[in-house]
Swiss-Prot record:
Family matches, as Pfam families: SSF
Family of the protein in this entry: Belongs to the sodium:solute symporter (SSF) (TC 2.A.21) family.
PANTHER family cross-referenced by the UniProt entry: CATION_ACETATE SYMPORTER ACTP, SODIUM/PROLINE SYMPORTER-RELATED
Cell compartment(s), UniProt: Cell inner membrane
Name the UniProt record assigns to this protein: Cation/acetate symporter ActP
UniProt KW keywords: Cell inner membrane, Cell membrane, Ion transport, Membrane, Sodium, Sodium transport, Symport, Transmembrane, Transmembrane helix, Transport
Membrane topology label: Multi-pass membrane protein
Length: 549
């Protein structure tokens, strides 16, 4: 595969596909001092928030969940900030720029998982858990095996996602700011560690909230200026875009991104169920006081994200008009300077001048910081809370657990920087696709069935969960992205790019079969305990709130 701008596609779920659709060579741009100054303002402000947060982090609850004192509205903004990546902004708008209507269809994949979280997961998750989703999965099952599986699933997802984000950050900053790749990776790693190490969930939450507000403001302004240009008429917008786009009226037709129904279904399932299995997203539901606030969190987050993806559609069509038809934004060969991923950035310059271009570039960097901070905290909690405090050293004090968590943050940060260096010139787009497939095939089935299926047993959850995880990994390796494009084989053993349809099926079937055939005394006891769990999940009786949470 040609060297592509993985900076944005890497941050996009199932980005292997997006990388093909919006590829463009990485070209280091001149140093953008406006962007650097605005980003430094953001860094200074957020480090001030981290210092403020560090004075309020006194307990395990404060560190992992901000004491459970985040409101539903604040948490909704933070979730949106955690989920809306640089790829969502620049990558989706680039897809619209190149493929038109197909870009809108693709962006819907990011939203379809949220109704599942709202109606099936958020309330029960908050009522049953404390710090991580493993608390919920192990509520009536054996603590050790389930927490090990959940922690492994979380850490694999976090590691893959983190590598992709670090490499993407380096490439993106090299492109937008003109900074050296290695400096960019170290900068992201150090800031990430500082936010999480000193400020915990409270600092991470406010970094995500600020990033979400800035991103929504920037995208809203760009969309407003585009619509102003066409007299606030969507008919004029589409007509002018079709008139200047090389594909003409074809940009208004669907069907160009996914070639067969199996791939389309697998991609959709992976996006839908993967979202509901991402550890750094699920962890956010423990930062609110009760199930009602958890539901409100999803409601607000879905609203913010839905609005945002509508804006990216307008921005993409605006870029077709104002950027694609303007020779000033093209190189000697007629291609967009910096690649198609720069479409929204060039549009920022077209509608707001150099100052607004600097603002959008700084927001793109802030976006990456918000995402990696959430990932790091989720990985640290999986090690310190799930593995250390509940498996390897049961009865550990809060102080010991927090110490392990902070050591893990440092280790994760250093590893992320090193892997960012090692994977600089590699095609890492598949990593986020694999992360979503694992989240959908391991984490999601266990969370869902542990809350809803009374006959689930530890044996079924363990065997089915591991089968789902391994199937996702093996099929991804044997598929076209890794087997052909990376390893260089002539033909893929597994013909489909997205394994989720098959790995999710294997996980659910495995959990059902091994639970149904489990006639052990332990399995029967676990089934009997479902009623007490169900009452707790529905009523919240016994849930600790606020600072005692």
């Amino acid at each position: 595969m040609k060297r592509v701008l993985t900076a944005l596609a890497a941050a996009l779920p199932f980005a292997a596909h997006a990388a093909d659709a919006i590829s463009g060579a990485v070209e280091r741009q001149p140093t953008n001092w406006q962007a650097i100054i605005m980003f430094l303002i953001f860094v200074v402000f957020t480090l001030g928030i981290t210092y403020w947060a560090s004075k309020r982090v006194r307990s395990r609850s404060d560190y992992y969940t901000a004491g459970g004192n985040i409101t539903g509205f604040q948490n909704g903004l933070a979730i949106a900030g955690d989920y809306m990546s640089a790829a969502s902004f620049l990558g989706i708008s680039a897809l619209v720029f190149t493929s038109g209507y197909d870009g809108l269809i693709y962006s819907l994949g990011f939203l379809v998982g949220w109704p599942i979280i709202l109606f099936l997961i958020a309330e029960r998750l908050r009522n049953l858990g404390r710090y991580t989703f493993a608390d919920v999965a192990s509520y009536r099952l054996k603590q050790g095996p389930i927490r090990i599986l959940s922690a492994c699933g979380s850490l694999v997802v976090v590691a893959l996602y983190l590598i992709a984000q670090m490499v993407g950050a380096g490439k993106l900053i090299e492109l937008l700011f003109g900074l050296n790749y290695h400096i960019a990776v170290v900068l992201v790693g150090v800031l990430m560690m500082m936010y999480v190490l000193f400020g915990g969930m409270l600092a991470t939450t406010w970094v995500q909230i600020i990033k979400a507000v800035l991103l929504l403001f920037g995208a809203s302004f760009m969309a407003f200026m585009v619509m102003k240009h066409v007299g606030f008429s969507f008919n004029n917008l589409f007509t002018e875009a079709m008139a200047v786009h090389p594909k003409g009226t074809a940009i208004m037709s669907p069907g160009g991104l996914v070639q067969d129904p199996i791939s389309a279904l697998s991609l959709g399932l992976g996006l839908m169920f993967g979202t509901a299995g991402l550890p750094h997203i699920l962890m956010r539901f423990f930062t609110v006081s009760d199930a009602r606030e958890a539901r409100k969190s999803v409601f607000y987050a879905t609203g913010f994200m839905g609005y945002f993806y509508i804006l990216t559609f307008i921005i993409g069509f605006g870029a077709i008009m104002l950027v694609g038809a303007n020779p000033a934004y093209k190189d000697a060969a007629g291609a967009l300077i910096g690649g198609n991923n720069m479409a929204a950035v060039h549009l920022a310059n077209a509608v707001g001048g150099n100052l607004f271009l600097g603002f959008i570039s700084a927001v793109a960097f802030a976006t990456i910081l918000a995402v990696v901070a959430g990932l790091t905290l989720a990985g640290a909690s999986a090690v310190s809370h799930d593995l250390y405090a509940n498996v390897f050293r049961k009865g550990a004090t809060e102080r010991e657990e927090l110490k392990v968590s902070k050591i893990t943050v440092l280790v994760l940060g250093v590893i992320a920087i090193i892997l960012g260096f090692l994977f600089e010139n590699q095609n890492i787009a598949f990593m986020v696709g694999l992360a979503f497939a694992i989240a959908a095939s391991c984490n999601f089935p266990i969370i869902l069935l542990s809350m809803y299926w009374s006959k689930l047993t530890t044996r079924g959850a363990m065997l089915g969960g591991w089968l789902g995880l391994l199937t996702a990994v093996v099929l991804m390796i044997l598929g076209p992205t890794i087997w052909v494009q990376i390893l260089g084989h002539e033909k893929a053993i597994f013909p489909y790019e997205y394994p989720a349809l098959f790995s999710i099926s294997v996980a659910f079937l495995g959990i059902w079969f091994f639970s149904a055939t489990d006639n052990s005394a332990e399995g029967n006891r676990e089934r009997e305990q479902f009623r007490a769990q169900f009452i707790r999940s529905q009523t919240g009786f016994g849930v600790q709130q606020g600072r005692a949470h």
